[in-house]
């Protein structure tokens, strides 16, 4: 199993930095592989990628490879960052939405996590139910005659 994490930080302005981490949770190392992702937040022609080779982009499709043919051992994580984004992401699904790895003539599925803000803790969800207060006695019958 492969797992991809996404994070975003607002620097450098105006669109910030997109960071990706691919973790090999499988039982075999990845050798001579590429990572493909689809994302609504695209990398523009004027960009900087650190820790990976940016092979190509076609619309929302992006393909990356490790530097110098590095392999990804079992339990290891490959991290890289990209600057020069089309826009800042606004939602947790604005980074990699789908991903797959091509290795050894096979296409391997990748589980993708939601985008997180790298510079801030995640916001707590709102309460699911309002705080309740009983002002009348509780009735177990569906339609009691009186309370």
Residues of each region from the PLM?
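Short acidic, flexible loop segments centered on an aromatic residue
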Residues: 23-57
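Short beta-strand elements of extracellular/lumenal beta-sandwich folds
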Residues: 2-31
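Generic structural motif
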Residues: 1-10, 54, 98-101
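N-terminal carbohydrate-binding/catalytic regions of secreted carbohydrate-active enzymes
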Residues: 147
